A protein has these predicted regions:
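Short, small-residue-biased leader/transition segments that mark boundaries at the very start
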Residues: 1-7
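Metal-dependent active-site segment of extracytoplasmic phospho-/sulfohydrolases and closely related
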Residues: 9, 13-18, 301, 305-342, ...
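Active-site nucleophile/metal-coordination loop of metallo-enzymes that catalyze phosphate/sulfate
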Residues: 15-166, 170, 199, 207, ...
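Active-site regions of oxyanion-processing enzymes, predominantly non-cytosolic
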Residues: 148-152, 191-196, 269-290
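Active-site His/acidic residue clusters
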Residues: 156-166, 248-251, 277-311
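Extended, H/D-rich, highly charged conserved domains that either
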Residues: 165-166, 173-242
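Glycine-rich tight-turn/loop motif centered on a GG-T
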Residues: 168-169, 211-220, 252-263, 295-303
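Substrate-binding rim/cap in mid-to-C-terminal beta-strand-loop elements of soluble/periplasmic
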Residues: 342-383
Length: 391
């Protein structure tokens, strides 16, 4: 098996979808394929590192050759959970199958009934109620809030209800109380959102509004123990890089490293590989593929971001020691050529690399992302309670 040797440091980076999910029709995502369509739009991608690892074997990707002797094990994974959001995908990687999905309101905004209930319980009206970036929503409604004291509420492609409030107009404790009220309302299965976020800001007018550090998240914690908890309880390091600590609400995390971009995330991962003698898992979420390019339906930008990632991946691989294991995978698709702005239900790649590997090949596709958590726990001889078997 790929994990027959013992690896001291395991590094998991998450990236992008490769189409063909068996249940794509249930999500109205038939025909989506993030990487294939980006390759077509960009007239081929130049990703020599991923190509040498064998990524081209996972589909028909213009510019990424199918090579006979890949340097890694490569395979396709299907998601078994209900949902195609960030939390669901990451939780499944670490062993949890979500049956009742988190609900997203990307294309519709929250229903009137939800908003009315929130307005009644908080005593203020709402404006916004669309999927929007944090800066744009403030430029659109900030001045209105200065005049009226109405809540600014908005969402994104993930399962979130965000409430923006100017710190001089609405006191922080009132904002936090409103978030608790929203969290309570959003426990209803019809409106079940993964997280409610307080988004306080300051500033005097359009173009001058800035968010403050007083953000607060009211997230649903994983509903059972994950592989991260199992590792932590057995005294292994679990380093969460990027959004990982938020996604797991800090559960099972022993060290947090914040990032501001893909490049920053990869640089910090390269630093970890170079300088941190940890024993356990480093779990990295690269934010830009999704936020900057997938949701904004910018295929060219996405392609350039994959090429940049490929350059940094080579540097990371050069820093790996003989007893390191690297996995590159994804939590969902986000086809930038598809309608709407939402994630897309797709298979995801799993590329597993170590300098110790003697034979490398394409493995059969598997039916859950949970094999990632299973394989990591198996390596460290930690009992795994989640879905999926070690490979």
């Amino acid at each position: 098996s790929a994990a027959s040797d013992v690896y001291k440091r395991q590094i998991v980076c998450d990236s992008m979808g490769i189409g063909n999910a068996k249940d794509a029709d249930k999500y109205d995502d038939l025909g989506t394929n993030t990487v294939q369509h980006i390759c077509e739009k960009c007239d081929g991608l130049n990703v020599p590192t991923l190509e040498k690892l064998g990524f081209g074997l996972l589909g028909d990707f213009k510019g990424i050759n199918k090579i006979s002797y890949p340097k890694a094990y490569v395979m396709k994974l299907n998601e078994v959970s209900n949902g195609k959001d960030t939390m669901t995908g990451h939780w499944e990687m670490m062993g949890l199958k979500t049956v009742k999905p988190f609900i997203t309101f990307t294309d519709t905004g929250f229903p009137d009934e939800f908003i009315k209930l929130f307005e009644e319980k908080t005593g203020r009206k709402c404006v916004g109620n669309i999927a929007c970036s944090g800066t744009k929503i403030l430029d659109t409604y900030g001045e209105h809030q200065l005049k009226t004291g109405d809540w600014i509420v908005y969402t994104s492609a993930d399962s979130v209800f965000q409430i923006a409030a100017h710190e001089d107009i609405i006191p922080l404790d009132e904002l936090y109380k409103a978030c608790e009220i929203a969290r309570e309302i959003a426990m209803d299965d019809r409106w079940k959102v993964g997280r409610v976020i307080a988004r306080p800001y300051i500033g005097s007018g359009e173009g001058q509004f800035t968010r403050t550090a007083n953000r607060h998240d009211y997230a649903l914690a994983p509903f059972a123990k994950t592989a991260l908890d199992d590792l932590k309880e057995n005294n292994f390091d679990v380093i969460g890089v990027g959004k990982i600590p938020d996604i797991f609400v800090d559960q099972g995390i022993t060290k947090k490293i914040r990032t501001v971009s893909n490049e920053d995330g990869m640089n910090k991962t390269i630093e970890l590989a170079k300088n941190e003698d940890f024993n356990g898992l480093a779990f990295i979420n690269l934010v830009d593929f999704d936020a900057m390019y997938g949701h904004r339906r910018n295929a060219i930008g996405y392609g350039q971001a994959i090429e940049s990632f490929d350059n940094q991946l080579k540097i990371l691989i050069d820093e790996l020691k003989d007893d390191d294991l690297l996995m590159v995978t994804a939590d969902h698709g986000n086809d930038p050529t598809y309608k709407g702005t939402d994630h897309t239900r797709e298979q995801v790649p799993l590329v597993i690399y170590s300098k110790q590997f003697k034979d490398h090949k394409q493995l059969n596709e598997e039916n859950t992302f949970g094999i990632i958590g299973a394989t990591i726990c198996d390596n460290f001889d930690v009992k795994y309670n989640g879905i999926g078997k070690s490979i």
